[in-house]
């Protein structure tokens, strides 16, 4: 889908469909009134017939509206007068696209810029609108014998006044890059585990580097991981025929001597649970256990498209967790790259084992800050559901920055405590720590475990178990989150 920004008068713009907002109570805003006046009152006449009340998300299609260059006019309900919430604005955008995609026109022009969204300026509301519209075009039918018909709608024109055109163009450009990154993340997450594995993710990273010469990729194989002493990482992979990979992405868009930000992604391409085998029901969704790594790749896709003046390193800790005669057993003790020993009480708590060695590896980059992203705990879904990612860390300023990025990107996170008292749940009589902390506060104790490997830099942990994918039903699939949050965080850090 192509996004175009124009400051043309909607009354004189030639388009297949002109989209106009109508408030609850059939109220027309300034733009809608001007269009209605040019059309000899055709819009207000249609509203008087009572076919559209103006509630959020309602639509009404008008054909052959006089004196307009548009072939048809789509009226979209915008709710009560005043500021809209992000959720309401997204509902309006989704309803707009839902109506447009069923029409015959190849383009449409939107006059939704005058709608007010709480806490958002022209840039903020335009980006939210553009991201919602673009993300709605996503489809994954790679393995369907019959492909979905190509969408007729090819171009969306965002109409604005000349004074705000630069901000609207900037927002549209950022939205396109973010949604492109989300699409890559969703594609990788939706791939079946027989085709998506550590070596294939390494190939994806290399392909991205071929497209953008500002990205360098290094892939550390099993031999190199052994040389580095990554005993925790290797323990996860030893039950699988798929070899592990630590994929290092290096983007240098800032000054050479500028410390980078490091994004660490959990990349368990299939998580059976290992010897601590998961229940069979829903196990197919454990292909999504690599969505942390996929979101880092997607964020890099957006970062590269935007060419941000910032240095960023990505670490994708990729392995497959399978049961076999060579698999790790409950009770095994392994030595991590940091030298700390871990008693593995549950082989299904494997994500933290690959991450802990990746976090130690991150020290060599002398980072400004490190954020790890992982589908780490089912407990996070219990605590926060699917609306917000869990957030913990060791630096208040970094936590605040991540929370703010989530709010600005409408991809929210919520902070959970990381009190010292929780650390005691990881005590082991045989090793420096256990890899689980019992049934209570599972999301927090998982973060406590990771915190022991992130003491030498500012660190934040995003648990995306509830936000990375949608379970079951027609909407089942990867969401692309938290690419918007992560990209916003980097946009904020690269702002002059």
From Swiss-Prot:
It comes from Azotobacter vinelandii (strain DJ / ATCC BAA-1303). The active site is at residues 278, 352. This is Probable cytosol aminopeptidase. GO terms for biological process: proteolysis. Mn(2+) 2 binds at residues 266, 271, 289, 350. Belongs to the peptidase M17 family. One of its GO terms (cellular component) is cytoplasm. The keyword Kinase does not apply.
